[in-house]
Design a protein with these regions (language model features):
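Post-cleavage N-terminal segment of exported redox proteins
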Residues: 1-48, 184-190, 194-195, 221-242
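Surface-exposed patches in mature extracellular/periplasmic domains of secreted proteins
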Residues: 67, 133-139, 229-237
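The canonical Cys-X-X-Cys-His
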Residues: 55, 61-70, 120, 218, ...
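Electrostatic cytochrome c docking/interface patches
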Residues: 36-60, 72-75, 79, 104, ...
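A mature extracytoplasmic/lumenal domain signature
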Residues: 71, 138-140, 223
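Short pre-active-site segment immediately N-terminal to redox-active cysteine/selenocysteine motifs
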Residues: 62-66, 71, 104-107, 135
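Electron-transfer interface patches adjacent to heme c in soluble/periplasmic c-type cytochromes
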Residues: 13-22, 80-214, 242
Length: 242
């Protein structure tokens, strides 16, 4: 094969590389748009509640993703430690997704329900009070900072534009649902659970008050992770699954 021209002309070599990489990318990526099980259809998945979404925003803002992944790989040691391997469907409403394998702390894909709200509140305030060997910084200001939910409806509308299936009812009640999720045994809380099945309703930071704190939001988000899919009924079989 005559390749002298490529060796002597860096621009031509660059163009050749781009062409080859483009063809390889198309061959591998394009078929995924026609494969039904690229993202599994999994029962139970729903958009985040307004409080969970606010907590996720705080999770990203504080850089939690730098030390914690949310992707359990199919390796035996990870499945035995953390639980069922992560499904693509579990991240389908994440913008941006929280995948990764670099961990300073444990993976959080299945942390929901593993610890109590009080444990999370104390751990986020002073990690070494519960885990002496922890290198995680504390976030005591979250409990004292009132959650600003004035733009929550606009946030959900933006997410809807990129494919998150928020209904008009969800959008209309966005700010109301922030309060409802920290108000157990109320009519509004019942309406919230109707809109968002399996949503946990509690005063997550264990402090009195009628308005959510940033700590409420972050704990609500953590307590939801990994709880939506019922793996007792999940069938990982399909014509396109490998």
């Amino acid at each position: 094969m005559q390749h002298e021209a490529f060796e002597k002309n860096s621009l031509l070599l660059l163009i050749g590389i781009l062409i080859v990489v483009s063809i390889g990318g198309l061959v591998q990526i394009a078929p995924l748009f026609w494969v039904d099980s690229t993202i599994e259809k999994v029962r139970g998945m729903r958009p985040y509640t307004p409080l969970e979404q606010a907590g996720r925003d705080i999770y990203v803002r504080e850089g939690c993703y730098g030390c914690h992944s949310q992707m359990i790989r199919t390796l035996r040691d990870e499945v035995e430690r953390y639980g069922h391997y992560s499904l693509a469907a579990e991240s389908m409403y994440d913008h941006p997704f929280q995948w990764g394998s670099k961990r300073t702390g444990p993976d959080l894909a299945r942390v929901g329900g593993k610890y109590s709200d009080l444990w999370h509140a104390e751990h986020l305030s002073n990690p070494r009070a519960l885990v002496p060997e922890s290198v995680m910084p504390g976030y005591p200001w979250l409990a004292e900072t009132k959650l600003d939910g004035r733009d929550m409806m606009a946030k959900l509308m933006t997410l809807k534009r990129v494919g998150v299936p928020y209904s008009e009812d969800m959008l209309k009640n966005a700010e109301q649902d922030l309060i409802a999720q920290i108000s157990p045994d109320t009519r509004k809380a019942a309406e919230l659970v109707r809109r968002y099945p399996k949503a946990k309703v509690a005063k997550f930071d264990n402090k009195p008050g009628q308005e959510p704190s940033e700590l409420d939001a972050l704990i609500a988000y953590l307590q939801m992770l990994g709880t939506l899919v019922d793996f007792a009924t999940f069938d990982a079989a399909g014509p396109n699954l490998r």
